[in-house]
């Protein structure tokens, strides 16, 4: 990931930090500043009031916050915290969210990035995964525009049927948002969270053939294409 490494060298790296192996927990920590022991989002979230734990006969499952996080009270099994993005907005920043959100379950306040202080939301909603990266499948929508999966990516209708991989569509939208932000007489903050490299392991055909030629298996080449598309 040479481009990610290049950005890191120009920015700030956190070398004494903990990232939970469940991505929901890490995102909730990023937005609220609370670690997963405190916010108690210890598994992935999706549907309101529904835990996603697998049944177990050997361990007692914890009572965790399966509705995610929020800035307001009133939703059970939810950690209430302050968003650093809201603090930025209150202090004059133009705030942009692009890509994966996954802060709160469906139909809770925290599911919408605007709840957290983002003035612009591009493709963020309750799900942390996605139905497909493929525009040929409308990123998880039927031809009449209805999502056929809870993980259908919203907000990318302009790219349906164009042949543009979801990762590239998000990158293009982020660049457009930054170009607009530069015209404003204020600082800006972009939270960029690609859906890649989450399953499904779809083939990004811009890069897939290259890895096949290098001798990788079909699945390995597809996974490598996701990584390069994210790093582009």
Q: PLM features: what roles do these ranges have?
A:
Residues 46-94, 101-188, 194-203, 217:
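Formylglycine-dependent
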Residues 13, 20-25, 36-38, 101-105, ...:
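Solvent-exposed loop/turn segments at secondary-structure junctions
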Residues 32, 112-114, 205-212:
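Short secondary-structure boundary/capping segments
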Residues 3-4, 10, 26-27, 80-84, ...:
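Stable alpha-helical elements in mature extracytoplasmic
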Residues 185, 229-232:
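Active-site neighborhood of glycoside hydrolase catalytic domains
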């Amino acid at each position: 990931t040479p481009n990610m490494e290049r950005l890191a060298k120009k920015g700030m790296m956190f070398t004494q930090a903990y990232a939970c192996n469940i991505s929901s927990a890490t995102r909730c920590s990023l937005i609220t500043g609370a670690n997963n022991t405190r916010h108690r989002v210890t598994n992935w979230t999706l549907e309101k009031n529904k835990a996603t734990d697998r049944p177990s006969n050997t361990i007692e499952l914890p009572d965790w916050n399966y509705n995610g996080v929020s800035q307001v009270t009133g939703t059970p099994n939810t950690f209430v915290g302050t968003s650093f993005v809201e603090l930025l907005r209150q202090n004059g920043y133009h705030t942009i969210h692009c890509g994966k959100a996954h802060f709160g379950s469906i139909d809770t306040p925290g599911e919408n990035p605007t709840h957290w202080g983002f003035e612009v939301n591009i493709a963020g909603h309750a799900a942390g995964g996605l139905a497909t990266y493929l525009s040929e499948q409308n990123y998880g929508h039927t031809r009449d525009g209805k999502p056929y999966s809870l993980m259908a990516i919203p907000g990318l209708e302009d790219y349906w049927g164009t042949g543009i991989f979801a990762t590239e569509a998000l990158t293009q939208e982020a660049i457009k948002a930054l170009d607009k932000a530069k015209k404003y007489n204020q600082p800006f903050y972009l939270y960029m969270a690609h859906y890649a490299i989450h399953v499904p392991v779809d083939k990004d055909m811009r890069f897939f053939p290259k890895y096949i030629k290098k001798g990788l298996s079909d699945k390995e080449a597809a996974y490598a294409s996701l990584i390069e598309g994210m790093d582009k």
